[in-house]
A protein has these predicted regions:
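Acidic beta-strand-to-loop metal/phosphate-binding motif
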Residues: 82-89, 184, 232-242, 561-563
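Conserved "right-hand" nucleotidyltransferase catalytic core of DNA-directed polymerases
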Residues: 153-214, 218, 256-270, 288, ...
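Active-site flanking residues adjacent to catalytic metal/cofactor-binding acidic residues
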Residues: 20-21, 87, 125, 185, ...
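A polyanion-binding, active-site-adjacent surface
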Residues: 1-154
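A short acidic (Asp/Glu
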Residues: 29-31, 94-98, 193-199, 244-249, ...
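Anionic group-transfer/hydrolysis microenvironments
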Residues: 23, 54, 88-90, 128, ...
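Metal-dependent phosphoesterase core characteristic of DEDDh/y 3'-5' exonuclease domains
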Residues: 34, 38, 42, 96-131, ...
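Short, basic/hydrophobic alpha-helical segments
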Residues: 67-80, 218-233
Length: 571
């Protein structure tokens, strides 16, 4: 562990601040430039010391960091250090006992090691990360502001003074909202899928501190009337989510009500704005954009976003407050990134490409992709049986039998090494079977039992066993039948493990079909849309079993299902 000081004076017996940073970035001039110089002039530079953080390899375990932190805290306490700036996420968690680092950016926290709670900890940003992620400049500034304010006794918790003129759980009187030319809006629902969830609350805010939250678990007629007649702009963050839910619950009479869906979408078509879209065009760069409201508004609202996976299990008053902070934060994000988007000439794209695309995406998500239930069930049954047959075939190969014996023997030997007297017999692990989904088992079969050449390796340096590697091995060793069997099994595993379960969870509608309703997102590194819940863009199209999978998708009654393949569109 190295250390450095920032004055020419002799070493002190005590210091106020200790900057802790990874050994690979432990450079005095860089530390001084990024962490010492930004401190207020009233802070004595002689009261600052920097230490390198012990690393036994490129990435360290939580247990290793905890052990080293326990050693370091004793030294820091002996030097009367009051503030620790930890520019490393793993060590920050070790010093505080917290499970996450990034949400605690900008907070002054107590040390979590017993007996040292009097020492304060600040989560810092390593200056080395600035090279590959320019967004870390803001995070570094926030962390240094936290340290500086703590040292000058001016620290205030992020989000402390958010609320101005606010009303929680107001009645259904939306009339006063008409006077505001723009309202940030946000809903809280019992789930992500509008077809399987309910609306609970909706919040509106006309600036970064003032707003109202409405309980909409009951009658929603007044809300629908307000949204229809409101002449201003409605600002959402991730507009597709909120508008999609509002359209379904307020305008659609049933799951297949296309007319109601179109009427609802028309209400929002010319009156919505999206702070996520503005942030997307304002920050789009070579790094994957971080576009969640909680991340974009962190320096404004702080870590208010406790993971709410089931809103029915939290106090309703807490939900109302959470909903209100969302709309205040939405206004903050809009006000922060709109000037940047305008300065960078991004508004034409936002108005004429992004927003129209959002309307199309919302319609896609509400309509969904229909599936024939009978064909889907038959596909699941056939593929399950086929996989069972392939597994039986695989286990019958002499090479696999030999590999399995070796695996069991190694387990017994390893176990017996830990025993002092009683030894387990060779049959102790006979319950273990060869697992075709285990990279270790397959690698042992391919590269030890069969002695095949290692053509590819994983990121960790182990011999690869993925489908691409099996394809190469099959071409090089066409007479080894066990390779063909493994490839067939792998081609089924993703379908049975990922796609079939997602298909079976589709929304069953009145026409007897199940529908997939994926969610599409901007902001991925490739610049394309991404899809989740389920991933509609990764449905098999060219694999061995793709044609069977495609048979599940059918057109609704009186409709045609048409596909267009723009395979070279990005060129």
């Amino acid at each position: 562990m190295s250390y450095t000081l920032f004055t020419d004076e002799a070493t002190n017996d005590s210091y106020s601040v200790a900057i802790l940073i990874k050994e690979s970035t432990f450079d005095k001039d860089s530390i001084k430039r990024h962490y010492v110089n930004p401190l207020p002039e009233c802070i004595d530079r002689g009261s600052v010391i920097a230490y390198s953080l012990p690393y036994n390899k490129l990435a360290i375990s939580a247990s290793y960091a905890k052990l080293e932190a326990t050693k370091m805290i004793k030294l820091l306490d002996a030097q009367k250090v009051s503030y620790i700036y930890v520019a490393d996420a793993t060590y920050f968690k070790a010093f505080t006992g917290l499970t996450k680092a990034k949400p605690n950016l900008g907070y002054l926290l107590k040390c979590g090691i017993a007996g040292y709670e009097h020492i304060n900890v600040v989560y810092g940003i390593s200056y080395g990360s600035l090279i590959h992620n320019e967004r870390n400049f803001e995070d570094l500034s926030l962390s240094m502001f936290t340290l500086a304010s703590a040292l000058t006794n001016s620290y205030s918790k992020i989000g402390k003074d958010l609320f101005g003129d606010v009303e929680l759980n107001t009645d259904n009187d939306y009339s006063k909202l008409h006077s505001h030319p723009m309202l940030a809006a946000d809903i809280e629902t019992t789930g992500l899928n509008p077809f399987e969830s309910e609306l609970w609350t909706i919040a509106f805010a006309w600036n970064e501190h003032d707003g109202k939250v409405f309980d909409i678990r009951g009658d929603k007629t007044a809300l629908k009337e307000f949204l229809t007649t409101y002449k201003g702009k409605l600002l959402f963050h991730n507009a597709t989510f909120d508008i999609k839910h509002l359209v379904y619950h307020l305008w659609m009479k049933h799951d297949l009500d296309i007319e109601g869906m179109l009427d609802g979408l028309d209400v929002f078509r010319n009156k919505f704005e999206d702070s996520q879209g503005i942030a997307f065009v304002a920050t789009n760069n070579c790094n994957e954009n971080v576009l969640s409201l909680k991340d974009l508004a962190h320096e404004f609202a702080g870590n208010y976003a406790v993971d709410v996976k089931d809103i029915t299990k939290i106090p309703f008053d807490a939900l109302l407050e959470y909903n209100l902070i969302d709309v205040l934060a939405t206004n903050y994000v809009w006000n922060k990134y709109l000037p940047i988007a305008i300065k960078d000439n991004q508004m034409d794209f936002y108005e004429n490409m992004y927003k129209p695309s959002i309307m199309t995406i919302m319609q896609m998500e509400l309509v969904g992709l229909p599936m024939d239930n009978d064909v889907l069930n038959k596909l699941s049954e056939d593929f399950t049986k086929y996989n069972d047959d392939l597994q039986k075939e695989l286990l019958s190969y002499p090479e696999v039998i030999t590999t399995l014996k070796s695996i069991r023997k190694e387990l017994v030997d390893a176990h017996n090494l830990r025993l002092k007297t009683v030894q387990h017999p060779d049959t102790h692990y006979d319950h273990i079977e060869f697992n075709s989904a285990s990279p270790n088992h397959v690698a042992k079969l391919l590269y030890e039992t069969l002695g095949l050449e290692v053509l590819n390796r994983t990121k960790t340096g182990n011999p690869s066993t993925d489908n691409d590697t099996l394809t190469l091995l099959r071409a090089r060793y066409p007479d080894i039948e066990v390779l063909r069997c493994l490839m067939d099994i792998q081609s089924l595993e993703k379908i049975l493990g990922t796609y079939i379960p997602a298909f079976l969870k589709g929304t069953l509608k009145a026409d007897g079909r199940k529908y997939l309703h994926g969610s599409y997102r901007f902001g991925v590194l490739s610049g394309r849309l991404s899809s989740v819940n389920p991933n509609m863009q990764a449905i098999p199209s060219t694999s061995k079993h793709a044609s069977r999978v495609k048979e599940c998708f059918v057109a609704p009654d009186n409709w045609l299902l048409v596909t267009a393949d723009f395979s070279s569109l990005t060129i």
